[in-house]
UniProtKB/Swiss-Prot annotation:
Its EC number is 4.3.2.1. Its main location: cytoplasm. The keyword tRNA-binding does not apply. GO terms for cellular component: cytosol. This is Argininosuccinate lyase. Pathway: Amino-acid biosynthesis; L-arginine biosynthesis; L-arginine from L-ornithine and carbamoyl phosphate: step 3/3. The gene is argH. The lineage of its organism: Archaea, Methanobacteriati, Methanobacteriota, Stenosarchaea group, Halobacteria. SUPFAM superfamilies: L-aspartase-like (SSF48557). Keywords: Amino-acid biosynthesis, Arginine biosynthesis, Cytoplasm, Lyase. It comes from Halobacterium salinarum (strain ATCC 700922 / JCM 11081 / NRC-1). One of its GO terms (molecular function) is argininosuccinate lyase activity. CDD domains: Argininosuccinate_lyase. One of its GO terms (biological process) is arginine biosynthetic process via ornithine. PANTHER family: ARGININOSUCCINATE LYASE.
Amino acid sequence: MTGGGDPVVRRDRFSGGPARSFLSSMDGDGRIFEADLAVDRAHVVMLAEQDVIGDEAAAAILGALADVEAAGFDALPPGEDVHEAIETAVVEAVGRDGGKLHTARSRNDEVAACIRYRLRADLLDAIEVVVALRSALADVAAAEAETVMPGFTHLQPAQPTTVAHWALSYAGTLARDTGRLCDAYGRTNESPLGAAAFAGTTFGVDRERTAALLGFDGVVANAADAAASRDFLLEAVSALASVAVTCSGLAADVVFFANRGFVEVSDDYASTSSIMPQKKNPDTMELVRATAGDAVGAQQALATTLQGLPRAYNRDLQRATGHAWTAVDGVTSAVEVAAGVVATAGWPADDLEAAAGEGFSTATGVADALAAGGLPFRTAHEVVALAAERGCEGATLDAVAAATEAVTGEPLSAVVEPAAVADALDPVGSVAARDSAGGPAPAAVEAAVADVRDGIDADEAALAAERASLADAADALAAEVSGYV
């Protein structure tokens, strides 16, 4: 160290003054400490293999990096960021040869590599909890395939459905959200190393080698693109925001259902009032719902930071990264909680079935039955609307018969078998009749659950394979490092 606490590296220019703390990112850099060590090790191994630096210098640097790791992030010397602080620690330990660590490299490609390295791990964690939520929804669907409940549009009773059909609706959206996260992961898992500041390097580096040592799928081809672009952050945060928006709808439904007595939220995921001891509040799902605002806010903040930036590197990018961490942490936590709520919720079948018949919610099914008997659907619609108007709730066979005769001039039996209308008036019968693909009938639900579980199995297998691939790369890097130290 030099007098006054200046870092060893880059100490000759612009090292002091009030801007020092403003420029520093050390407060948030603990998150990428391990990533930077891995990136440093892969870079040093590659430099030695390419004869850019000697084996002795490589061994000394790698040994110093091991000491830095053992001491931990909090033991780092002062620095503008974790990258500079680690290099300073290496130079202090090794001497001048420690400065060879940064050969053929800029902080620009180094920082980008560290962000990608850490973000990909976070994305895998996010994918894992989203798949777990889908699995919980599939389990609910399988268990509640015949549990009839009211379905709503505009929060008004619309048509009878089932708990299973409701659960599967979210499982489907979350499957697409999983795909978006996987797409973001694929474009995150590319190496920018070797780009240097933005225009490459005169040294004979092997970009593919460092990419392989770090488990990246390949390299970002153009050096300026590799060093300067943060579109992978925007894609990841956008995918996370989509997950959060999906879960906000799920959470809103659970809060609404709890208010109506349609679902029993486990005590583990509820709270009571500080003054009203009888209260059981679904607070966790209210916070899950609010997470969408945080995630979309991070998305907007990130996009605003990135818009209009000229090529190649701009310090604005330092402020961009935190928005990604905010989104991935908040969304992952919220999805994990949502999965727990879904997995432990109780569904009171008798109460749900009774509520399913309220508000003449079987009206559409009755109109369908009349249309199946030969009435034009619009005429059938008029009949049922009149039955609802005359009968208030309207859910009686007599009301439908009277309305049919009033509109058509014929008795109900001349249009359709009254038994068909009676079945359509019954919430259970109404659900059973809607057996088209994707519908709520038990047979349709059974097929849908099988498809959903096939998708879950495929995504779980892909996730396990990707984690194994990264673990293999980490083992391979450790083996290469052990050849020097």
